[in-house]
Curated annotation (Swiss-Prot):
Organism lineage string: Eukaryota, Viridiplantae, Streptophyta, Embryophyta, Tracheophyta
A cellular-component GO term for this protein: endoplasmic reticulum membrane
Record bears the keyword Transmembrane helix: yes
Motif (Histidine box-2): 114-118
Motif window: Histidine box-3: 246-250
Keyword presence, Ribosomal protein: no
Keywords: Endoplasmic reticulum, Fatty acid biosynthesis, Fatty acid metabolism, Iron, Lipid biosynthesis, Lipid metabolism, Membrane, Oxidoreductase, Transmembrane, Transmembrane helix
InterPro entries from the UniProt entry: Acyl-CoA_DS, FA_desaturase_dom
Protein name (record): Delta-9 desaturase-like 3 protein
GO molecular function, one term: oxidoreductase activity, acting on paired donors, with oxidation of a pair of donors resulting in the reduction of molecular oxygen to two molecules of water
Pfam families in alphabetical order: FA_desaturase
CDD domains in the record: Delta9-FADS-like
Membrane topology annotation: Multi-pass membrane protein
GO biological process terms held by the UniProt record: unsaturated fatty acid biosynthetic process
Length: 299
């Protein structure tokens, strides 16, 4: 499906493996400890979920998981990071707030990291570069904030967000929002709701996102002549809200649509298109035919 060129070996050779940085025996910052604790708690709750199954909990988890992870891709990624479309603030802010509960951090941090990824893709300065191994690009990079700072410098690439009081507020209070959410979920549905929505939903959301950083730079197909190892993995499309059309994305970073063919499932694009039809999403960016011809591997 959509595989114009399968496993282009020349692109894979661009990522030269780098010597691994020490993971356990290093200085851990407070943020590192908080992150590993949160990720560990989510996976522990996931392990407890089979012993706390109810249909209501499963249904609630599906609703929370889809809405929060769709908010990540719709808000954090395509709206805030790449500015691929514009929203009125009364609509932009609620989506950004909803994304908090996907447990991937606040907008300033997430957007800054992803902008660095595109600026330094597959290089020594890429925050989650595949040249440092699958598990580093998949998850370990998250727990070494000092290393990210060494490679990329300060987060001065998100001044557009730092200038807005709402995003500064989320940055300073994210822990309070997450803890309050977990408490409310527990009070509403007990352990079944907590283990399934936070545990199972959180773990699936984590690994779906992380596979874009790891697997989508190692396996899959390439349709576009990008100067990196980005790839499309079709079967991940529904689970990642359309983000696994990663070679498409790296070819046209500003595009609001990642599934460029009609058969490439892209739930995030469907939501953007819906708001565009309503006149709420404006300045929606899409690649032109000339841009596609220039980037195509088939030319």
């Amino acid at each position: 499906m959509g595989d114009k060129n399968k496993d282009d070996s020349s692109s894979q050779s661009k990522a030269v493996r780098k010597e691994k940085r020490a993971f356990l025996f290093r200085k851990w910052t407070r943020v590192d400890v908080m992150r590993v604790s949160a990720v560990g708690a989510v996976h522990l709750l996931c392990l407890l979920a089979p012993f706390n199954y109810t249909w209501e909990a499963f249904r609630f988890a599906a609703m929370v998981g889809i809405s929060t992870n769709l908010s990540i891709t719709f808000s954090y990624h395509r709206n805030l990071t790449h500015r691929s479309f514009k929203l009125p603030k009364w609509l932009e802010y609620p989506f950004a707030y909803s994304a908090l509960f996907a447990l991937q951090g606040h907008p300033i941090d997430w957007v800054s990291t992803h902008r660095f990824h595109h600026q330094f893709t597959d290089s020594d300065r890429d925050p989650h570069s595949p040249i440092e191994g699958f598990w580093f690009s998949h998850v370990f990079w998250i727990f070494d904030t000092s290393y990210i700072r060494e490679k990329c410098g300060g987060r001065d690439n998100v001044m557009d967000l730092k200038q807005q009081w709402f995003y500064r507020f989320l940055q300073n209070t994210i822990g309070l929002h997450i803890l309050t959410f977990w408490i409310l979920v527990y009070l509403w549905g007990g352990l079944p709701y907590l283990t399934w929505s936070v545990g199972v939903g959180g773990a699936i959301g984590y690994h779906a996102t992380w596979l874009i950083n790891s697997a989508c730079h190692i396996w899959g197909s390439r349709a576009w002549n990008t100067k990196d190892t980005s790839r499309n993995i079709w079967w991940l499309g529904p689970f990642t809200m359309g983000e696994s059309w990663h070679n498409n994305h790296h070819a046209f970073e500003a595009s609001a649509r990642h599934g460029l063919e009609w058969y490439q499932v892209d739930l995030t694009w469907y939501l953007i298109w819906f708001f565009q039809v309503l006149g709420l999403a404006t300045d929606v960016k899409l690649p032109t035919d000339a841009q596609k011809r220039k980037m195509s591997l088939a030319r």
